[in-house]
Swiss-Prot record:
Pfam families: SDH_alpha
GO molecular function: L-cysteine desulfhydrase activity
Protein's organism: Shewanella baltica (strain OS223)
Record family assignment: Belongs to the UPF0597 family.
Protein name: UPF0597 protein Sbal223_1296
GO biological process entries: L-cysteine catabolic process to pyruvate
């Protein structure tokens, strides 16, 4: 196997992984669980300091197993019930009694949450205390990337900040393009990528859960009611939108099921998976073709998102759905050129969508971008594409660079304004 392909597989395995609950509050739960383990005893007070972006994405989303919202319950639950060895599934096992103890700690004023100024987009510092004992755990650059651990003021672990690598730079130094991703997905031995089929299983279960039970805004269930009433049809477009949104409904509503995430986002893992799976079912392709399409979708999304920070004012579901649309063209028997058309079309359609925090309405944004993915892949199959208009260049690689430039240079102040509005 080509060394370049092994790099691609390593990247996918590093950032396409199960995550239980929205990853920003889960980062705080994980840090708190590690701090508790370091302390050696359940703390009687917890202080949490986070970056603005992590704060933004934790304000309105339910923490799995708790039925509650926010960083305070995430940190308290992590300290009381979290498994420090479980990463993003830190809260996979939690009892009602433990939730009650976590809430009691909050009610007693023993859990504080503060925003802190930092250049890092993903930053969380948890200080857990018990009597005169104190444990500090700092996460920096990635949701489970521990940068420092201290016990009673003494350093027990630290990472040189110059060596720490944030998730946003994961493709740095790697020879990767949309074309190389497309060829890799087509040609790599099936056995090497079979693991990606777990994404279909995990995110499919979330979708089923969102359709079966009332979570969040019930976007998926609302569409199902519309189909049953004869208002809308159950075609591929509506089925993709319905089932993708349902998975997001469940995730944002605190369902106790993991999502297969993509670069730290469960919703984007869902958006990279479910439309591709349903398209594969529509075209009755083999399991191998599905795996190749999922690899194309997930790695394509990772590559595009590596051009800008991991958390920003930009809703990443847009570019994730662009990568999914590329994979959908592949499943339909389209060409590489048409796959590029699909990416261009989705980005042209939905690139104005902002991120105003993780919450129930994220399911609506997931449905919007997934709908764009379907329209765009159908247009691409007819060789209709946006080219040389607005931020869309004539070349897909240039378009991707334009997106990165727009977010890095043009949306920083937007992010600050959104956070100020949400915090007012």
């Amino acid at each position: 196997m080509k060394p370049q392909w092994q790099q691609y597989i390593n990247i996918i395995k590093q950032v396409v992984k199960p995550a239980l609950g929205c990853t920003e509050p889960i980062a705080a739960a994980y840090a708190a669980a590690v701090a508790r383990a370091l302390l050696g005893v359940e703390p009687d007070s917890i202080a949490v300091q986070v970056s603005d972006n992590l704060y933004k994405n934790s304000m309105g989303v339910f923490v799995p197993g708790t039925g509650k919202i926010g960083l305070a319950i995430a940190a308290a639950a992590g300290a009381i019930a979290g498994n420090p060895d479980a990463g993003l599934e830190v809260l996979a096992v939690i009892t009602p009694e433990q939730v009650a103890r976590a809430q009691a700690l909050i009610d007693a004023g023993k859990v504080t949450v503060e925003r802190t100024e930092t250049a890092e987009f993903i930053y969380c510092c948890v200080i857990a205390k018990k009597g005169d004992r104190e444990a500090l755990v700092k996460i920096c650059g990635g949701h489970t990337l521990i940068a420092e651990k201290r016990l009673n003021g003494e350093s027990v672990f630290s990472v040189d900040s110059t060596q720490a690598k944030a998730t946003g730079s994961i493709c740095e130094g790697v020879d990767i393009t949309i074309e190389s991703i497309y060829r890799f997905a087509q040609e790599v031995p099936f056995e090497e990528i079979k693991f990606i089929l777990e994404a279909s299983e995990l995110n499919g279960k979330l979708s089923d859960e969102g359709m079966a039970n009332p979570y969040g805004l019930e976007v998926g269930r609302t569409m199902k009611s519309g189909i049953a009433a004869g208002i809308i049809g159950e075609d591929l477009l509506n089925k993709i939108v319905m089932l993708t949104a349902a998975a997001s409904d469940a995730r944002m509503g605190g369902a106790n099921l993991p999502a297969m995430s993509n670069l730290g986002s469960g919703n984007q893992g869902i958006a990279a998976t479910i439309p591709v799976v349903l398209t594969a079912q529509c075209y009755k392709v083999s399991e191998e073709q599905l795996a190749r399409a999922l690899i194309m979708s997930h790695l394509g999304a990772i590559y595009i998102k590596s051009h800008y920070p991991p958390l920003s004012a930009f809703c990443g579901n847009t570019v994730t759905s662009a990568a999914a649309s590329m994979a959908m063209v592949y499943l339909a028997g389209g060409s590489f050129e048409q796959s590029c058309f699909a990416i261009q079309n989705v980005i042209s359609d939905s690139s104005g969508m902002v991120c105003d925090g993780a919450k129930a309405s994220c399911a609506m944004k997931v449905s919007t971008s997934s709908s764009a993915a379907v329209r765009s892949f159908l247009m691409a199959l007819s060789s209709h594409n946006v080219s040389g208009q607005g931020i869309i260049a004539t070349d897909v690689e240039k378009t991707i660079k334009n997106i990165g430039k727009m977010i890095l240079n043009g949306m920083s102040s937007t992010d600050v304004t959104i956070i100020d509005i949400m915090s007012a």
